[in-house]
Structures are given as C-alpha cells and as structure tokens.
C-alpha cells in the first residue's frame, strides 16, 4: 500500500523540463511494439518458429523489466531536478537585459512562421511584376 502511495506521488510530480524524454520513450516503445506485431503477423511460414522463440524471451525479459523498470524513471527525475537547480541558479545570476533579449528572441522565433507565410503568399505577385519588367508588357 505504501508503494502505491509513493507511485501516485511520483507520478503527480511530473518532470518540469524533461517530460518530452519520457513521452519520446513511450512513443518509441509503442512504435517498436507495433512494428514487431506487424512483422510477426507477416512472417508467413516462419510463424511457428517466432512463436517458439517468443516464449523463452518473454520468460527472461519480463522479470528483468519488472526488476529494473524503475531505474530509468528515477534517473530521469534526478537529471530533471538537476536541470531545475541549474536553471534556477542561472536565472538568479543573469542580468535583466539578457532575460529581456531572450524573451525578444523567443517572440521573434514564434512570429517567424507567420512572416514566412505572408512572404510566400506575396511572392507570386512579385514574380509576375518582375517578369513583365524583364520580358516586356505581354
């Protein structure tokens, strides 16, 4: 029961900066599982051999996974807490002008796709004008 409470507390905390790593790992495992199931389904005459090998592999892999599955999550939480501490230290020591500059850079980056879209939409009209200038009024 105490383990369930610890698991719920650990899941509730979440990762502040490295949550994407956990999401990417979940996505990779799901994709690999789907590819494996597809390959197993399409193995044709090799299907009985795949089924025979799959049993012993599961008998070895499942206990190992159950024994060591907490390690990557704990390591990821440790690294995330280290990143949080580093960001806090850096945030305290940076002068305000650097913080303002980084905010301006982020806003410029966020505005870049819209600027590119507007530029791309205006290009066809400009190329027609240039074609008329170079090739005459036809």
From Swiss-Prot:
It is found in: Cytoplasm. Localized in all laticifer layers. Transmembrane segments: none annotated. Keywords: Acetylation, Allergen, Cytoplasm. Induction: Induced by tapping. Not induced by wounding, ethephon or abscisic acid treatment. Induced by ethephon or ethylene. It comes from the Eukaryota. Belongs to the REF/SRPP family. In solution, able to form amyloid fibers and aggregates rich in beta-sheets. Interaction with membrane stabilizes the protein, inhibiting the amyloid state and aggregation. PANTHER family: REF/SRPP-LIKE PROTEIN OS05G0151300/LOC_OS05G05940, REF_SRPP-LIKE PROTEIN OS05G0151300_LOC_OS05G05940. This is Rubber elongation factor protein. It comes from Hevea brasiliensis (Para rubber tree).
